[in-house]
Design a protein with these regions (language model features):
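Flexible glycine-/small-residue-rich
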Residues: 20-22, 35-37, 117, 320, ...
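Soluble periplasmic/extracytoplasmic beta-strand elements of cell-envelope proteins
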Residues: 15-19, 32-34, 162, 446-448
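Extracytoplasmic gating/loop element in the C-terminal half of outer-membrane beta-barrel translocons
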Residues: 84, 293-294, 406
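Residues embedded in well-ordered regular secondary structure
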Residues: 23-138, 176-179, 195-247, 260-262
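Short, glycine-/polar-rich solvent-exposed loops and beta-turns at beta-strand/coil boundaries
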Residues: 8-12, 140-143, 177-179, 436-441
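Flexible, glycine/serine/threonine-rich loop segments and coil->beta-strand junctions
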Residues: 2-16, 23-29
Length: 510
């Protein structure tokens, strides 16, 4: 095999197509089931300061910085009062926030039932699967139902058809992730152990900690959580409960089909179609609550987001492969058409009469309605070809030519031509290398040159006129990259195969 660049850059027009196992021909129908149940638990827990140690290090930090101590820790009398408060409301060590957000023994189960069989000319494989997984972090649950079908049909001696389609429905509950300011796990790591999880049944609250009741509403479920007293983090348990009021659902349909016609033993035509369709729906609700100055929402908010994405690709190729003595000649001609369309509609409103989840509908809001959305479309048409020559599996040469037209660029700059060429010499097959065959089974020297296009820009970006950053430039087209490479590929003796590649490459973007 002789390749020049990644096939998705040079020849392969179908960059995204569903591909799974096919049904078996001439097999009796077989029904199978596999599944599992399990439990997940973090194997390692962070060691956090208890309440007494937290006070000690908090005072030490203030003293070393030449600052006044926090009033609650300034005197031994206050410290004793704080530790008494902690002991009666959270236990002697205080709140271990990591434990409060972790779901020990998170249950998970998966089930899959499949049917596989066929006749002499038709094979079918169909499977139905269900997954239900509780997250290790509370509130991060996941459910999925998937249905996959694969079809394999031998229409005649020279004509065959394969097709597959998969449908996946996912439902998720999310937590705030990857945000050092508000993330649930970050908050659990940064919240102090003095603060109890809840504030609705506290006892022996020192007067200098009375701010823990700021904004407290006894009849508001989301107001029962304590605002963190000695850091700017949010109460992670309350945050999880609020985010549980929002649901996220996704639907995916992925399908592909390939019609193959062997015109002659040396000439083959393929027509491939692929699609990738997705839909997503977010039903969001942010309740009204106040825990402290860092953790509050003045109004409850109803949010609904709908988005869709459609991707289609249709590719036609005509391939030629024939041998003449020690010569092997290959050629390929093809065309590919791709289209992507995306749209999104987002709506929100505030001022729902209460925090009842049943009232979390857009029509129930009274203030600050907002609607936004956008469409996005792009397409690409490609023509490509390849010629390869192989003599005695020792001397190999290949040339590719690709012409792409992308709707992302301005008129007059939509099309680009991208040639590439490579050559290789399998010197391990030469007669002067016979003495090495006991330890070197394959060694090849190759060199290549290729021009690679790049359409990784936003659609319509060329229409931008003014901007304040380097990214707001008028884009007539995207840079091309010229790549020159050379290398040696070796494979050790087949009985103890060890392979390696030594290569060098130079790229220039213009």
């Amino acid at each position: 095999e002789l390749s020049i660049c990644n096939s998705s850059k040079q020849i392969c027009g179908s960059r995204s197509r569903s591909s799974t196992k096919s049904g078996s021909l001439e097999n009796k129908a077989q029904v199978s089931y596999d599944g599992y149940i399990g439990w997940q638990t973090p194997w390692k827990r962070p060691h956090m300061l208890n309440a007494a140690d937290y006070i000690t290090y908090k005072n030490l930090a203030a003293d070393n910085a030449g600052q006044e101590r926090v009033a609650a820790f300034a005197t031994q009398e206050n410290i004793d009062a704080v530790l008494n408060f902690v002991n009666k409301n959270s236990g002697p060590n205080g709140t271990y926030w990591w434990k409060e957000i972790i779901n020990d023994g998170a249950f998970m189960h998966n089930h899959n039932i499949s049917v596989n069989g066929g006749t002499k000319n038709i094979g079918i494989l169909s499977s139905l699967a269900y997954t239900d997984q509780d997250g290790i972090v509370k509130g991060s649950n996941y459910k999925r139902i998937s249905w996959r079908n694969n079809f394999n049909m031998k229409i005649s001696k020279r004509v065959s058809l394969t097709a597959n389609v998969g449908i996946i429905d996912e439902k998720r509950q999310l937590i705030d992730e990857n945000n050092p300011a508000t993330g649930t796990v970050f908050s659990a790591m940064g919240a102090d152990p003095i603060t109890p999880v809840f504030r609705n049944n506290l006892v022996d609250v020192p007067i200098f900690l009375s701010q823990i009741y700021n904004g407290y509403e006894p009849n508001n479920l989301y107001s029962q959580y304590s605002g963190i007293l000695f850091s700017n983090k949010r109460n992670p348990v309350g945050q999880i409960q609020r985010m549980r009021q929002s649901t996220y659902e996704y639907l995916y349909v992925k399908a592909g089909a390939n019609l193959e016609i062997k015109l002659f033993d040396f000439l083959k035509f393929n027509s491939r179609f692929g699609m990738d369709i997705s839909r997503s729906l977010t039903d969001g609700f942010q309740p009204k609550y106040t825990l402290n100055a860092n953790d509050y929402a003045n109004e409850n908010t109803v949010i609904q987001d709908n988005s869709r994405s459609n991707y289609f690709v249709w590719e036609q190729t005509l391939s030629y492969d024939q041998s003449f003595g020690k010569f092997k000649i290959g050629a390929l001609l093809g065309t590919s058409a791709e289209e992507t369309s995306v749209s999104s509609v987002n709506a929100s409103i505030q001022g729902v009469i209460n925090n009842d989840k049943d009232m979390a509908i857009l029509n129930a809001g009274t203030t600050n309605p907002a609607v936004s959305g956008y469409p996005y479309d792009n397409s690409m048409l490609s023509f490509f070809g390849r010629v390869s020559l192989d003599y005695d599996s020792k001397y190999l040469i290949a040339a590719n030519l690709r012409r792409d037209g992308s709707s992302k660029f301005a008129d007059g700059h939509k099309w680009g031509t991208f040639p590439s060429v490579s050559a290789a010499w399998r010197f391990s097959s030469e007669s002067f290398m016979e003495s090495t065959h006991n330890w070197l089974s394959d060694a090849k020297l190759r060199i290549s040159y290729g021009l690679i296009g790049n359409q990784n820009i936003s659609g319509g970006g060329y229409a931008s006129t003014y901007g304040s950053t380097i990214y707001d430039r008028y884009s007539f087209g995207s840079p091309n990259t010229a790549s020159i490479g050379a290398g040696i590929i070796t494979v050790g003796h087949l009985k103890a195969s060890v392979s390696g590649t030594v290569s060098t490459a130079s790229e220039q973007t213009y």
